[in-house]
Amino acid sequence: MSWLRSSPLRQSFSKAGGGSGSGASSRGGNSTNGTVRAFDASECDPKACYDSFCIHWQQAFEIIQRSENNRGQSHDDVLGVVTHLDHMVTLLLVELHHCNKVGLPGAPAPPAPCLEHLLSENLLDKLYEWGVKTGRYANAVRLEQLKLYEQLVSHSRHQLLVHEPFLRPLLKILASSQNEIYPPDVEKRLVILLNQLCVVLMQNVHLLDLFFFSTAQQNGSGGHANFIIFSLLIPYVHQEGSLGHQARDALLLCMACPRRLDRGTYIATYSSICPVWFTRAGEGLYSRLPNQIDIKTIDWYRITTDDVTELQELTLFMNSLEFCNAVVQVAHSMIRQQLLDFLYQGFLVPVLGPAVLQTNVESQISAMAYLDLIVRSVTEPGLIQIVVKFLLDEEKFDGQRILDVLVERLNSNDTRLCMVSLSLFDTLLSLNCEDIMLELALKYLLNCQHVPISHRFKVNRVDPYSNAVEYFLNTSPDIMKKVNNVLNINNNNNNTSQASSMLGSGPSSMPQGGRNVSKTIGANWNHYGNNTGETLMANYQAYLLEARNRIVQCKHACDQWNNVYRYQKLSKLVNNSSSLSHSGNGTAGSEDVRTYKVQMIKNFLAEFTTAPDSAVDMAGDGDRSSLCQSPAGMFGTGHHASHLMATTSKQLDSLQSLGDSSGYESLNITNLGTGSEDGRRHEAWKVSSVKEETIVDLDLSEDLFAQGTVSLGPFLTAIWGKLQTFTSNCLYVNLHLTGLISHLAWFPLPLLHSILLRPDIPTTSDTPSFHQVLKILKQQIDAELPDCDESLEIVDVARSFLVDREFRLINMRKNAIESNPHSGKLLLPNGATGASGPVSMTSNLSQTTPMQLTPSSSYDPFKRNDTKRKSISNSFSSIFRRPGSSASSGLAQVFQFFTGGGSSSNSSSISHQSSSTPSPAGSQQYLSSNSSGVSSFMGSSRRESREAETQFVDHPSIGGPPSSMGPTSLTSTGSPHNSLEYSLVNINGSIVGGIGSERQRDLAVSAVVLDEWLKELAAITQEQCIIMISDQVSSQKPGKLS
């Protein structure tokens, strides 16, 4: 029947002649070569068109009558009717084009004699009755009828649906199409017609009743029938390509109609869209996803848009999820609620929950990656709400919460699982959800038991001098301070002799302070302009700008929360007394409040009777000023009130750490003799109450875990635990870890600031405080990476490696296309047989490429954050981030970048690397245009650059022959302790053999990352302080800041 399938569809009043069958040549003399003859409606005589229309119908009707008398349909009969019908459609389009011309206001509509004849003579009904009897030609005739209806619905300005001669045969052909399997061309025409009908219904909502009542009549049983448009469209919702897209668009349009009428109940009750969707999406599409993902790149950590495009099963699942998100956005409230209920009860709990709770590590990685993809894709608050409910639900999973399981996996020794977990929590934080933040951290900090009593008054106060900024900058390792000084000297030298500096003129042209540092510090960093010595990305101002943007965005979201999470200085009793004073006897109530305040102060002073008077007075005055503040802005309503009562049973435990203003003094105190221990402790407490303490050396032999009994919660405890192993973690673990902590610091929550950004506030938790861990890392790096020429050169190579990685990301599209156009393919492993193969499929994410690497790809499930994801806001850290399975950390990976695994390939690798490095001018122009997104290490708005992080350098794997497949990803070759014998190559191509040990190289990378991260924390601290002061100035009178 190809001769009928090639029948022309006249669009925009053009006629396509010809076909693929033998009968095409008989079409009224039309060309058989597929030529197009354009129609000009202005040149056609309306009377002649009408006469021709009547003649074609008369001839077609004669053929219909003759075939009915012969009791059989011949090939020539069907072809003749179709040919005449084809000409009739053309004449109708010409007439409709003439009628649709814009006329004068108030002028009568031009006549449409052809259309009137079509309706008055019931031609459509006669065609339908004849088409039913055409036997094996029924599909071909139906195809022509669907084309006719489509043209009339889409081009006619008349409301044809209100005319019974048009509506009755239309409903007949739609009703007869239910539960039928048609050829692809008929399905396509049917979906197009349904789409056009939905457009008309959207424009004329009152016509929706015609289809509801008519479908009930078609059922004939007196009961309710499914809405016929839904019944026909639902089977195509999960189809691939344009057919599925048109079906989903049509359903969305039709669902938007009941939102304006009281038809949502009918659709929700009598249509099967929700059960069908979740049967296919939950049990069908998700179960087809690979159960295990074969990760080949060392820095992979999440599914990207290209992964979705490359893997057909994932594309179908995401299309279905996008459709669900759109339905929730536009549908009637009852439909929306039913859809959310089905999603929770039919997909999240029975399908996704068990998948996340699997015990196999590979399955856990894939399930968490899918969960991360789902959270990043949904945008509607209703969907986000049920996802949060899924994470916090205890009843559905035998008293075990999904969120608690995810927190436990942060401590995993598997690098890939740890990276995926960190990435997932970064995605959860990007939701800025109050419930998530409350469960992760805030509920453990609300009562402020982690802060000694004498310091709690500082929690809600602003540090106007921002001493924490200086603290973070001073915590940088000594080796990095030396390198930064050398860079500053070189930059000053560049201002006077830029040309010689660009060429790396050698030690003779460098100042004395920079002669012993390798040449790369003077050459490579000039790509960044005059401020290259301050930071890898640009300068400290860029960190400030990025920090302010992130904080403002986060603050805007947190302003919508139901509660204000601040430390409450008054107990529940005081709040109750205050409420009584307003409702009853005001004098008596106020007296009770004052009595209680005095008693609290007496209890406080009684604990420190041995302390000097001045210190006690200062602490007492501080608490008195805090206690006298109005409780109007305090948090504490509903079920959260139990977390806010001040407890005094463990105040003696807090006394132990009162001396650590910054968390370090008390550690040295405990090592002194018992005779002077108490005196030193009280002296330290006195000093910490009066002024900021300077950072002193930390005794690493001290047991840091014996300092207190207050827990910060499993989430923060897991984060601190990972931070303590910073120098031994994989490079990409550290990048995600630092980004996650920076993301926490963006929140405008003083309780979080007290443990992250306020070194002047000590903590009494059962783990080392955040600032203690930073000091430990500094001393560890200083001890193992001394300030010498060899260490400076190792750090120099590490910085060069990281900055060249940044350049490769800037030019990732060019490098990817030129190096390996076939990279990033998702392949099934050997032995897999596709959809009919084993249940546990494995998808090979051999190289996850950025979205821009697929020019033809139009799929983007992360549209909502598109404007954020376009920036290179990833600061220094987001440049080199993706987890590997288990690989050596730090500079153990530099060898693959520079040498490709052997000295024989050094020259080719370096030449390719050099070709991929942008010119200094181009680099500076790019960075200056993106200065607003330079500094942050992690965050939801940096997804695109992190997704794009992959290696594009053409080199073979370690110890293997040269690769013929273009660029290869960084691949794990075994355990994290593999012995890699290699030499480092600096940026100029010279081989630096045997520089330090592998441990020193790892420490060098850790030092660079730590140095940049501390700058970011300093910028965040400074901007948080400015924003808090601005808020107080706007809400209080000048001079009343406290």
From Swiss-Prot:
Give the family this protein belongs to, as stated in its UniProt record: Belongs to the FHIP family.
Q: Where is the composition biased (Low complexity)?
A: 905-940, 956-976
Tell me the segments the record calls region Disordered: 1-31, 494-514, 821-866, 905-977
Q: What protein is this chain from? A: FHIP family protein AAEL005291
Q: Which Pfam families match?
A: DUF5917, KELAA, RAI16-like
Report biased composition (Polar residues) as residue ranges.
1-14, 839-859
Q: Could you tell me the superkingdom of the organism this chain comes from?
A: Eukaryota
